[in-house]
Design a protein with these regions (language model features):
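Domain-level signal for soluble alpha/beta catalytic cores
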Residues: 1-370
Length: 370
């Protein structure tokens, strides 16, 4: 088994909020809510350790949304409360919509203070106090998500008459975030990035083209900006990225394999590992993994978080073998395809089903890699 992240058995980040915490979010504020979150996080860290995971997150228990909670805290970005972003998600029963407030870049982008710093410090101290050797992991949205969610219309041309200045400021703010979080002791940081998966879907590219983006080449811009944000990452910090096609209340937003982005994504993005959604036919085949260079890790998201039904070990092992035809088995790890609760509402499965899936991942990884 691996002793550094990403681990053979790993997970993306978000976990179902306990009912008591959901009630607390409705009735408590300030210190009282923080105490309820602290209690829930201590317990979920214990559960991750008990299952046998080598990394632990705080389940994103303090967030309402995996990405917007972060993005709105960047200096220069605000909520356009009179307008909403509409993201349409799909499931077997039909369509549902996620409608956060739209964002506006109204000043030059900057990092006023490290975002989620107190949250990470609490997770770090909780993990350290247990003396289990588990590595605390922080997840944040990729810089790509600021542009993907807002688009050109969200950027005030009076602030950024030259869009290249927008990109430079955005990457600089993220670079400072990475540095400051590293100074707090973070050695495992993940950039969550649905955009690089969405761009494989022709319908998504058509939508970006309609708003004025160069959709066919947008993934190259996003890769460039992520690399700029990571150019001075702290020594000893592992950076991974997670990609999926949407995860809201057991629904998805996009479909398509990784073919459109694969060669540039795997060959040029300067991260240590890729968490990739592969739980059903929407994700395509494993053939794009042939572009993964030696030394980079691929975390196969073979276990779905969208349903409670437990996968079989034999099926997981067979699919790992299939992936190993395109990338060396020693470069492969195993995880769920996404988080279990990308937003506070969570996916449609129980906490017991969630933890059973994480336990299955640990057991399968032990049997495959020893």
């Amino acid at each position: 088994m691996r002793t550094s992240p990403p681990f053979r058995a790993d997970h993306v980040g978000s976990l179902l909020r306990p009912p008591a915490l959901l009630r607390a979010r409705e009735t408590l504020t300030g210190d009282a809510l923080r105490e309820a979150e602290d209690e829930a996080i201590r317990e979920v860290v214990r559960r991750q350790e008990e299952i046998g995971l080598q990394s632990a997150t705080d389940g994103e228990f303090r967030r309402a949304s995996w990405h917007m909670d972060f993005i709105y805290r960047l200096g220069g970005i605000g909520q356009a409360t009179d307008e909403h972003i509409t993201v349409r998600f799909h499931n077997e029963q039909g369509d549902i919509e996620f409608t956060p407030a739209a964002l506006r870049v109204h000043e030059r982008i900057r990092l006023n203070e490290p975002i989620f710093a107190d949250d990470f410090a609490f997770l770090r101290d909780t993990v350290t106090s247990r003396n289990s050797g588990v590595v605390p992991k922080l997840t944040i949205p990729s810089p790509s998500m600021v542009h993907y969610r807002g688009g050109p219309a969200a950027i005030d041309p009076a602030v950024y008459p030259d869009v290249e200045e927008f990109w430079r400021d955005l990457s600089a703010a993220y670079a400072e975030q990475v540095r400051r979080i590293g100074a707090l002791g973070c050695t495992y940081l993940q950039f969550d990035d649905t955009s690089l998966a969405y761009l494989n879907d022709p319908a998504q590219r058509a939508e970006l083209s309609s708003r004025g983006d160069d959709a066919e080449h947008m993934h190259l811009r996003y890769i460039k900006q992520i690399n700029a944000a990571l150019a001075a990452k702290p020594a000893g910090m592992t950076i991974t990225t997670h990609m999926c096609r949407g995860n809201f209340r057991s629904s998805w937003a996009a479909s398509g394999g990784y073919d459109h982005v694969a060669e540039a994504l795997f060959g040029e993005l300067k991260v240590d590992g890729f968490f990739l959604e592969f739980d059903d036919e929407r994700s395509g085949g494993f053939e794009p993994l042939r572009f993964v260079p030696p030394g980079k890790m691929v975390v196969l998201g073979l276990v779905t978080t969208k349903r409670g039904e437990l996968e079989s070990k034999d099926t997981l092992k067979r699919r790992i073998d299939e992936a190993a035809k395109f990338v060396d088995l020693d470069q492969i790890c195993l995880s769920p395809q996404c988080g279990f609760s990308s937003t506070v509402e969570g996916n449609q499965l129980t906490a017991d089903e969630q933890f059973a899936k994480l336990r299955l991942i640990v057991e399968t990884a032990q049997e495959v890699w020893g």
